[in-house]
């Protein structure tokens, strides 16, 4: 009597490899089937995350030591037309809490957590060895970069990171607290807390330090960051015009 599998397929020995050719195997995380031979296997390709149609680009600007009324839309005597336009076309918040230190503010902004819960209770330099003061974002704290990257956005960052201890500022690592290990596809800027705006002491690109110590007379760090940000966004638009970005 012919032997059949669950789908009714004949598993008698008329197959050149024999009845075991029709056996199927499944693996966790794999939606296809693996048979004894290629003709009895079903492939499955992992699809990259794709943002919804019409998903917006997300631009976040964090400025150190910025007072409440230091921009025009909040009453500054200094003209800030581009920031004012962003405010006019978006939302302005007047009730908020912020830590008056750079590293804790960055950790809270990226994770949505109180800075102690995020692991950054004070400015990141040394790890004092107490809970809430790890000098880097906790590994189980999900960042905005991770959420948007995993939802289909390109995740980019330029500027000052300041979310890893001094012991992680070398090429030797560990690099657990670096931007590319914390949800970002690209990074350009500095990892520590400050630098010279005309001659930065150590610049980083993606996951490595740059060997640059000679800058032109008209070099200005902020202009460099702006140019790099535009370049990153341009590369995304050229390579994948419909993919949104988070910067």
Question: Model-predicted segments: where are they?
Answer:
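Formylglycine-dependent sulfatase
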Residues: 1-247
């Amino acid at each position: 009597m012919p032997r059949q599998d669950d789908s009714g397929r004949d598993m008698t020995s008329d197959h050149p490899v024999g009845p075991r050719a029709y056996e199927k195997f499944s693996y966790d995380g794999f939606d296809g089937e693996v048979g004894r031979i290629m003709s009895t296997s079903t492939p499955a390709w992992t699809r990259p995350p794709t943002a919804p149609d019409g998903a917006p680009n997300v631009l976040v600007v964090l400025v150190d030591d910025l007072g409440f009324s230091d921009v025009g839309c909040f009453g500054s005597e200094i003209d800030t037309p581009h920031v004012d336009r962003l405010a006019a076309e978006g939302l302005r918040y007047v009730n908020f809490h912020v830590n008056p230190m750079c590293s804790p503010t960055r950790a809270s902004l990226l994770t949505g957590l109180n800075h102690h819960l995020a692991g950054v209770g004070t400015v990141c330099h040394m790890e004092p060895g107490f809970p809430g003061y790890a000098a880097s974002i906790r590994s189980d704290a999900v960042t905005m970069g991770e959420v948007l990257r995993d939802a289909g956005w390109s995740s980019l960052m330029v500027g000052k990171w300041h979310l890893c201890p001094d012991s992680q500022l070398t090429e030797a690592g560990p690099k657990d607290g670096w931007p590319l290990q914390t949800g970002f596809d690209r990074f350009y800027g500095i990892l520590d807390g400050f630098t010279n705006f005309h001659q930065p002491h150590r610049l980083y690109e993606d996951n490595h330090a740059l060997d640059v110590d000679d800058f032109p007379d008209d070099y200005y760090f902020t202009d460099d960051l702006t140019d790099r940000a535009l370049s990153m966004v341009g590369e995304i638009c050229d390579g994948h015009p419909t993919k949104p970005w988070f910067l």
